[in-house]
Curated annotation (Swiss-Prot):
Reaction equations catalysed: tRNA(Arg) + L-arginine + ATP = L-arginyl-tRNA(Arg) + AMP + diphosphate
Enzyme Commission number(s): 6.1.1.19
Subunit structure as annotated in this protein's UniProt entry: Monomer.
Gene it is expressed from: argS
Classification via SUPFAM superfamilies: Anticodon-binding domain of a subclass of class I aminoacyl-tRNA synthetases (SSF47323), Arginyl-tRNA synthetase (ArgRS), N-terminal 'additional' domain (SSF55190), Nucleotidylyl transferase (SSF52374)
Superkingdom of origin: Bacteria
Cellular localization per UniProt: Cytoplasm
UniProt-recorded Gene Ontology molecular function terms: arginine-tRNA ligase activity; ATP binding
Keyword Aminoacyl-tRNA synthetase: yes
Residue span of motif 'HIGH' region: 121-131
Source species taxonomy: Bacteria, Bacillati, Bacillota, Bacilli, Lactobacillales
The protein's name: Arginine--tRNA ligase
């Protein structure tokens, strides 16, 4: 039972007409700790009880079960609860230390399946910094949902189909050099793609050639398929190298091409329900009643659009995985599109249309500039990660020149710094990336949190105690209460992050926990050999465990030494 649930249970005796969950929803945390740990407002009862809130509070406090509280007092229209800090603190520490790996878990998902579609880079292009957001928001959301007992199916829906591959094949036909591609596949293919886009305005025939190549691909042309397989293979090899650096693993790499083989079903369903309407030689689905633009299903030249493939994908995933949710981690600019996708599924008669959820995010800017592959100013994610590792290595060498596993720690700190900088921001906000600000050991950074955790581990090594089963945890001291109380709020943070698909909640929690521990460390002689030392070390262990857990939810490593 959480502290909040304990307060709700105490109030339930005085409010038998209210459900305990209703009571819990009304409980607040006072901004000023002098007003208690929890407060229950009585304004909402005034209308039904026909009494002033102050009088209601005074009458209710007489009926509240005050066992387990230091005191319960009336403050105007509020009932303020002061927890028995020594006992509550000991209970929090005991819960963490007994099973740190599972601390904070709550059962929201009941093991139901959730598909999550994220990262999804286009083949024949390098993974740029623009892919970082979808990849890391998706991975963190997946980990957070696993923490609340959902079963996640991670899908990298590769952009391996569409007219852009027709363009690339047209470019390769005109300027391609097989030896050059084999030597440096991704950058060479990118060079061809950028060139055909840059020259298309002066040469409209290039665009037409691209359309024709894609039509050949759709109709099974042998040469088109040979090129497609080659481009896909070399791309996936490069993507896997980046995913390994980020510790991201997928259950499926089925992309648009996989769905392109399954389009007959949604097209036939749309025809059967008389939803396909002719429009200037093409066929569309009218979504006027949803105040949405029409969906283009089949173009005037007979080729399909990506919405057709997405409809096929949605049907396949529901049938294959029986999901309770189907999540798509895609930029905010696609918001209207996902409304169209949901509306189309609803029109087709699928009652699970609302299981499709768009987890949107803002742009990633590099020093204030948006990135675009078409114009060629793509910044390689792999290069940025390596630069970040190099910068971390230099800073670690200055701080701890004798560190044995310095290279491994530099990787964990450098990669973690890039991930944390992305995830500490609310996902819908734009993020500006500047490497020098990211790999700092001070401020709101990943290395700051990792360093706080490494500091805790250093203290524990010096303290020499790792078994706290016989320690009197009530002796941690009054100065430890703020830190212990915050440890007790971890499951609330996880729940909030899960319900809102918002990893920044966990990142901010980790930052705040690191700050509170550093303040505690600055004002408390943790290693002083007195009767309270084992309890202080137990608290330090609990902080280390929860910081490691929070970082893991963000897919960030927690080095024991830095």
């Amino acid at each position: 039972m959480s502290d909040k649930q304990q307060v709700a249970a105490a109030l339930a005796q005085a409010l038998p007409e209210m459900d305990v969950k209703e009571i819990e929803a009304k409980i607040e945390r006072p901004k000023d700790s002098s007003n208690g740990d929890y407060a229950f407002p009585t304004f909402f009862l005034a209308k039904t009880l026909h009494k002033a809130p102050q009088m209601i509070a005074s009458e209710l406090v007489e009926k509240v079960d005050q066992n387990g509280f230091e005191k319960v007092v009336v403050a105007g229209p509020y009932i303020n609860f002061f927890l028995d800090k020594a006992q509550v603190g000991a209970k929090i520490l005991q819960t963490i230390l007994a099973d740190p790996e599972h601390y904070g878990e709550i059962d929201l998902g009941h093991q139901s399946n959730v598909t999550i579609d994220y990262s999804s880079p286009n083949i024949a292009k390098p993974m740029g910094m623009g892919h970082l957001r979808s990849t890391m928001i998706g991975e963190a959301v997946a980990r957070i949902l696993e923490k609340v007992n959902y079963n996640l199916i991670r899908i990298d829906y590769l952009g391996d189909w569409g007219t852009q591959f027709g363009k690339l094949m047209a470019a390769y036909e005109m300027w391609g050099d097989e030896a050059e591609v084999k030597k440096d596949p991704i950058n060479t293919l990118l060079k061809y793609y950028v060139r055909i886009n840059n020259e298309a305005d002066e040469h409209p025939e290039y665009t037409e050639a691209g359309r024709n190549w894609f039509a050949k691909l759709e109709h099974g042309d042998e040469e088109a398929w040979r090129l497609w397989h080659w481009f896909r293979e070399v791309s996936l090899e490069r993507f896997q190298r980046v995913y390994k650096m980020l510790d991201v693993n997928f259950d499926s790499f089925n992309g648009e091409a996989f769905s392109a083989q399954k389009m007959e079903e949604p097209i036939q369903l749309l025809r059967d329900k008389d939803l396909l309407k002719p429009s200037r030689g093409a066929e569309i689905v009218d979504l006027d009643e949803y105040n949405l633009p029409p969906l283009l299903i089949i173009k005037s030249n007979g080729t399909t659009t990506y919405i057709t493939r997405d409809l096929a994908t949605a049907l396949f995933r529901k049938r294959m995985y029986g999901h309770a949710k189907s999540l798509y981690v895609v930029g905010a600019e696609q918001e209207t599109y996902f409304k169209q996708l949901r509306a189309a599924l609803k029109e087709m008669g699928f009652n699970w249309w609302d299981q499709i959820e768009h987890i949107s995010f803002g742009l990633m800017n590099l020093n204030g500039k948006k990135m675009s592959t078409r114009k060629g100013n793509v910044v390689s994610l792999e290069d940025v990660l390596n630069d970040s590792i190099d910068l971390a290595r230099k800073q670690i060498a200055e701080k701890n020149p004798d560190l044995e596993n310095a290279d491994e720690v530099a990787k964990e700190v450098g990669v973690g710094a890039v991930i944390f900088h992305d995830l500490k921001n609310y996902r819908r906000n734009a993020v500006n990336f500047k490497l020098e600000d990211v790999v700092k050991f001070e401020g709101e950074t990943g290395p700051y949190v990792q360093y706080a955790r490494a500091r805790a581990e250093s203290i524990l090594r010096k303290g020499g105690i790792r078994d706290f089963s016989d320690v009197d945890l009530t002796k941690a001291g009054a100065e430890a209460w703020e830190l212990i109380s915050f440890l007790g709020q971890y499951s609330e943070a996880i729940k909030r992050a899960a319900l809102n698909y918002d990893p920044s909640v966990i990142a901010k929690y980790a930052l705040e926990l690191a700050k509170k521990f550093n303040q505690y460390y600055a004002h408390t002689r943790i290693l002083d050999k007195d009767e309270a030392q084992p309890a202080r070390l137990a608290l330090t262990q609990a902080v280390s465990d929860v910081l490691k857990s929070a970082l893991d939810l963000l897919d960030i490593k927690a080095p024991d030494e830095m």
